[in-house]
Amino acid sequence: ALKQAQADVQYAAAARAFNKGDMAECLEQFFRAIHSRYDIENPVPRRLIRRKLGIINTLKEQNKKLKEQMREQQERLRQYAHEYLLMGNECITQAHDIRAALANYDKALSLDPNYIDAWIRKGITLFNNKDYFDAENCFNTAVNLHPANFKAVYNRGKLRLKTENTEGAIADLDKATSLKPEHAGAHELFGDALLKAGKEVEAALQWRIAEELKKKKKQ
């Protein structure tokens, strides 16, 4: 009788643990209950098991639907962010309105904080406006998000060259020429950075590569 009562307590404890989401405790109590009284063939525990398994399946399906909804929402936000990026670009190319462009880039980033193109475009706009500190922060964010993104690395190197951070410029422009060896501008700026560091021979080599690439492009 004691074992029978103990089994009832353990089955109840297993059910409570399940309801709390503590699967480890649920299984522990369930196996203890089986050890106390083997009830698997009994209709009542079997119904309990089926009901709880049904809840698991329902939750899995709900979780799947929720993930799909979140994915669709994120996709919509990315699309809206892209539209704001395009509007920001138009503010620069057509209206020459830097403030409006930056506002659009900020809207794009509020919708998708990992939107690398928006960070880069914002950085370039700030750089052209001689706001070098904030521009570098934008490029830093872009590089952190995608260390192998050519535009992010190249533009940060260009900025660092402008702000006399020669060592940083050399590191970035060296990487940029590796990421995109056919980019003449990257080789040219890399040469400029090397010259500032007193490396005339290496600088001349990069300038020569840049000239060859420019000639090749004209052909």
Regions found by a protein language model. Give the residues of each.
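Alpha-helical segment of the N-proximal tetratricopeptide repeat
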Residues: D8-E28, R32, Q79-L111
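Position-specific recognition of the canonical hydrophobic site in helix A of tetratricopeptide repeat
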Residues: F18, I92-T93, I120, F127, ...
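Structural signature of tandem alpha-helical TPR/SEL1-like repeats
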Residues: Q62-K67, T93-N104, N128-T141, T163-K175, ...
